[in-house]
Every structure is written in C-alpha cells, then in structure tokens.
C-alpha cells in the first residue's frame, strides 16, 4: 500500500526546483556577460569571477583527460536517486533533513547539468582575504554545503520523544 506523496519528504522537492532556477540562472548570466577569467568586484573580499571547473570540488581531477566528467555525473545521479528515496521514506514533517536533501539534490543537479551540457561546471564566486583566494565556487556548491551542514546539525539536535502508546 503506498502512502500519499504529500505526507512524505517528497513534499519538499519544490526546493530542488528553486535551487536549480537560481543556480542555472546565475550561471546563464555569467556565461552571457563575462568572458572566461573576467572579474568584477562586488564587496571587499568578494568578486564575481568566471571560471570553468573540469573536475570536482577544488578542481579535483580536473586534468584527468575527460573521464572524470562521466564519473562525477554518475556520482551525482546516484546521490540524487538515494536522496530522493530517503525523502520518500521520511515524513514531510522532518523538515531539516528534507530541506538538506533537497538542497543537495538541487546543487548536484545544477552541476550535473553544467557537466553534461558544457563539459565543465561554471564557477563564479571568488571569496578572498588579502592575496589569499578560496577556490572559486557557484551557488550549487553552496546549496550542497549548506545541505551537508544541515545533516550534520540534525545529528546533534535532540530527538523528539517517542509517543507512548496506551
């Protein structure tokens, strides 16, 4: 017997769409208005800087000859499938976990789209202090990191007391 989808964590999939729209929209604006390597200062310690990432986080495996594109695409698809299954098994009222899963799925799909469409991931957020620059990243990366942090946070929060049955 199946349960109504609105009573499951799948109720939170709308957040995946929001993350995708914001992420892909920001990348579209960068691609339309920046040449590769262009930089525009936004605030002290924060630039928009168009970079291409052919690898994973911190350009891991970026110079590996192209196979990593499909490897990371497969990982993204696998993680998305697992997280959607976890959302289906969870209750809609488990907000923190479902929001975390949706953020990770949205970010993974945003970067997956880039990998499959362009062959690289569009990065544009350049955070720096003095001459030290953090790795350039994008909004999908931010969504994934926030989602992962929420999962860790949830692990430290007290669990609700189980209802006693009379």
Swiss-Prot record:
Membrane topology type: Multi-pass membrane protein
Reaction(s) catalysed by this chain's protein: Release of signal peptides from bacterial membrane prolipoproteins. Hydrolyzes -Xaa-Yaa-Zaa-|-(S,diacylglyceryl)Cys-, in which Xaa is hydrophobic (preferably Leu), and Yaa (Ala or Ser) and Zaa (Gly or Ala) have small, neutral side chains
UniProt keyword terms in alphabetical order: Aspartyl protease, Cell inner membrane, Cell membrane, Hydrolase, Membrane, Protease, Transmembrane, Transmembrane helix
Gene encoding the protein: lspA
Protein name: Lipoprotein signal peptidase
Pathway assigned in UniProt: Protein modification; lipoprotein biosynthesis (signal peptide cleavage)
UniProt xrefs under HAMAP family: LspA
Main location: membrane
Active site per database record: 123, 141
Compartment(s): Cell inner membrane
TM ranges: 12-32, 70-90, 102-122, 137-157
The protein's Enzyme Commission number: 3.4.23.36
InterPro entries on file: Peptidase_A8
Molecular function terms, GO-annotated: aspartic-type endopeptidase activity
Enzyme class: hydrolase
Family classification: Belongs to the peptidase A8 family.
GO biological process terms on file: proteolysis
NCBIfam families reported for this sequence: lspA
Reported function: This protein specifically catalyzes the removal of signal peptides from prolipoproteins.
């Amino acid at each position: 017997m199946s349960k109504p989808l609105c009573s499951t964590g799948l109720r939170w999939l709308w957040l995946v769409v929001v993350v995708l729209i914001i992420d892909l929209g920001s990348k579209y604006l960068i691609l339309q208005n920046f040449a590769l390597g262009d930089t525009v200062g936004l605030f002290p310690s924060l630039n928009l800087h168009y970079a291409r990432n052919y690898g994973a986080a911190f350009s891991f495996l970026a110079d590996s000859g192209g196979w990593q594109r499909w490897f990371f695409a497969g990982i993204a698809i696998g993680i998305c499938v697992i997280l959607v299954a976890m959302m289906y098994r969870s209750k809609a009222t488990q907000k923190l976990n479902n929001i975390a899963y949706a953020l990770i799925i949205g970010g993974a799909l945003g970067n997956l789209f880039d990998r499959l469409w362009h062959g690289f991931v569009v990065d544009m957020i350049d955070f720096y202090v003095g001459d030290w620059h953090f790795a350039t990243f994008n909004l999908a990366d931010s969504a994934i990191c926030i989602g992962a942090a929420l999962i860790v946070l949830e692990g430290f929060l007290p669990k609700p007391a189980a209802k006693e049955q009379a």
